[in-house]
Curated annotation (Swiss-Prot):
Listed Pfam families: IPT
Protein name, per record: Adenylate dimethylallyltransferase
GO terms assigned for molecular function: AMP dimethylallyltransferase activity
InterPro entries named among the record's database cross-references: P-loop_NTPase, Tzs
Source species of the chain: Agrobacterium tumefaciens (strain T37)
Residues annotated as signal peptide: none
Source organism phylogeny: Bacteria, Pseudomonadati, Pseudomonadota, Alphaproteobacteria, Hyphomicrobiales
Length: 243
């Protein structure tokens, strides 16, 4: 079985690359993302729209209400192994995402030692200014009012009505920044979807900078697979941590 692994920091184009390969191969994409397992925060977690998937298949490791909490890394890894094992009759799978904890669980597991042919592509952070430009564009898209999906701020305003969801939201990039922004400006969370243009721009910039901090931590803490063209078998269990 061929496993095509695509990993890298947020806003690096992983999903677009996975969709392209899925179109070319017909293989499903398994999302290596624990936050995307909560459909109630589809926009803020970066889940692609059905139209963006362009008829390709995308598999999430769970589907749960946010109040149940974010799926822990060990559970996500067990579900990933189940998905891969269950689909071994297929020619290949695409594994795409940027969960530091899940990728490191994979690095430590003997499951990935044998029985697979690996193709690995790691996307890099690159220049910080270029990253911030991409991140601002992405956040602006998340703030856009659409008929087919609530905006990030609408998701936050709705979920804030559930006290059990609040500490979880305060621990997720984007939502955490918006909550702090509301407190700084003495705004109710319910007011965030209707802030004026100036504050809109300010919040977009703040979230983009939070994404940059997260991307830097991903670059630092990701395991390291030999990539295609390395001239040696690709085996995740031999990974070394980037210090």
């Amino acid at each position: 079985m061929i496993l095509h692994l695509i990993y890298g920091p947020t806003c690096s184009g992983k999903t677009d690359m996975a969709i392209q390969i899925a179109q070319e191969t017909g293989w499903p994409v398994v999302a290596l993302d624990r936050v995307q397992c909560c459909p109630q925060i589809a926009t803020g977690s970066g889940r692609p729209l059905e139209s963006e998937l362009q008829s390709t298949r995308r598999i999430y490791l769970d589907s749960r209400p946010l109040t149940e909490g974010i799926l822990d890394a060990e559970s996500a890894h067990r579900r990933l192994i189940f998905e891969v094992d269950w689909r071994k009759s297929e020619d290949g799978l695409i594994l795409e995402g940027g969960s530091i904890s899940l990728l490191n669980c994979m690095a430590k597991s003997p499951f990935w030692r044998s029985g697979f042919q690996w193709h690995v592509k790691r996307l890099r952070l690159g220049d910080s200014d270029a990253f911030l430009t991409r991140a601002k564009q992405r956040v602006a898209e998340m703030f856009a009012i659409r008929e087919d999906r609530p905006s990030l701020l609408e998701e936050l305003a709705e979920l804030w009505n559930y006290p059990a969801a609040r500490p979880i939201l305060e621990d997720i990039d984007g939502y955490r920044c918006a909550i702090r922004f509301a407190r700084k400006h003495d705004l109710a969370i319910s007011q965030l979807p209707n802030i004026d243009a100036g504050r809109h721009v300010e919040l977009i910039e703040a979230i983009a900078n939070e994404y940059l901090e997260h991307a830097l931590s991903q670059e630092r803490d990701f395991p390291q697979w030999p990539e295609d063209g390395a001239g040696q078998p690709v085996c995740p269990v031999t990974l070394t941590r980037i210090r």
